[in-house]
């Protein structure tokens, strides 16, 4: 075999650990992680989420123990998602802005115990409506945009008053970021940040989450196509992100994560703003199921998937693996 002269041998730099480390372009750390948690009423109680192995709904007292672990592991923030009792759900979602409700109670407890832990709250009505939609509906089941926004503003103010560091509207109503920002300013909550779910797709990967918060049965066979985005579109995402930034969002989100990393990349390159991605319940469930069946190495695949988020441009990642990942990184 003739000797080949190769001016370029990229494999040279991949030969040893030290040189691979020196040219590593992206690094995942605990600073990149946000831990989503499901909170329920009561005391000293947990409920397993069957479609999300390893994930539990938990009462506020147990949530404080989880938060303590997050702090010890260096996780900067948690995201609260409430499981609302069926008897508190209504057509007008009045419980969403109850100052004595589950979310405000959880916020106050968390901020009292862990003032430096970031608390992010979900601003959306689907946990509170009897029909499982993210807003107020008309007689035909269509979500009324402006009527919904007025409720979302009340909800965001309720969370801010309780001490939330970040309110995160996930509803995809038009104009809600501007309305919430204006209300926060008027009520002197000038430091309350807005994480806008700017590009939230009408995805099939949300199923286990809806089980977790108890909205799946309410939604039934209905869908959210008239406000969440078509998975076929990415130009539309750019428009949505631009509008949210203009209206006062501090951070923007792409959801789901892995199937939409091209959108994450476009958002980061186009706008250069803090950009977040959500490794949603369906993504979590797929990886968990494959690992439990011995088909995949859980740690290796989770770490690779999250590194892909970072490579695409995500500044932070909401993932149900956050605590596991933080431990692995130790």
Question: What name fits each language-model region?
Answer:
Residues 24-25:
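Charged, low-hydrophobicity low-complexity segments
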Residues 2-4, 8, 16, 28-34, ...:
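Alpha/beta enzyme core
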Residues 19:
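N-terminal [4Fe-4S]-dependent radical SAM core
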């Amino acid at each position: 075999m003739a000797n080949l002269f190769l001016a370029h041998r990229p494999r040279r730099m991949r030969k040893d650990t030290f040189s691979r480390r020196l040219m590593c372009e992206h690094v995942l750390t605990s600073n990149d992680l946000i831990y989503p948690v499901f909170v329920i009423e009561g005391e000293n109680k947990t409920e397993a989420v069957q479609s999300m192995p390893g994930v539990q709904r938990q009462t506020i007292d147990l949530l404080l123990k989880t938060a303590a672990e997050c702090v010890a592991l260096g996780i900067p923030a948690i995201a609260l998602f409430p499981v609302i009792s069926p008897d508190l759900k209504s057509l007008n979602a009045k419980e969403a802005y109850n100052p004595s409700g589950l979310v405000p109670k959880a916020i106050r407890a968390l901020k009292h115990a862990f003032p430096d832990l970031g608390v992010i709250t979900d601003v959306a009505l689907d946990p509170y409506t009897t029909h499982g939609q993210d807003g107020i509906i008309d007689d035909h089941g269509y979500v009324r945009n402006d009527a919904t926004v007025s409720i979302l503003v009340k909800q965001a103010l309720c969370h801010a008053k309780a001490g939330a560091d970040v309110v995160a509207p996930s509803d995809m109503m038009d104009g809600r970021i501007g309305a919430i920002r204006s209300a926060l300013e008027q009520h002197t909550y000038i430091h309350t940040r807005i994480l806008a779910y700017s590009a939230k797709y009408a995805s099939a990967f949300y199923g286990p989450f809806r089980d977790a918060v108890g909205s799946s049965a309410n939604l039934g066979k209905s869908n959210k196509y008239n406000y969440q985005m078509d998975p076929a579109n990415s130009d539309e995402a750019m428009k949505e992100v631009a509008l949210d930034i203009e209206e006062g969002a501090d951070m923007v989100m792409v959801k789901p994560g892995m199937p939409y990393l091209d959108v994450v990349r476009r958002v980061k390159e186009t706008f250069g703003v803090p950009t977040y991605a959500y490794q949603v319940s369906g993504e979590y469930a797929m990886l968990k199921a494959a690992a439990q069946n011995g088909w995949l190495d859980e740690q290796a695949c989770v770490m690779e998937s999250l590194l892909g988020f970072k490579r695409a441009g995500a500044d932070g990642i909401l993932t149900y693996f956050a605590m596991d990942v933080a431990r692995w990184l130790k």
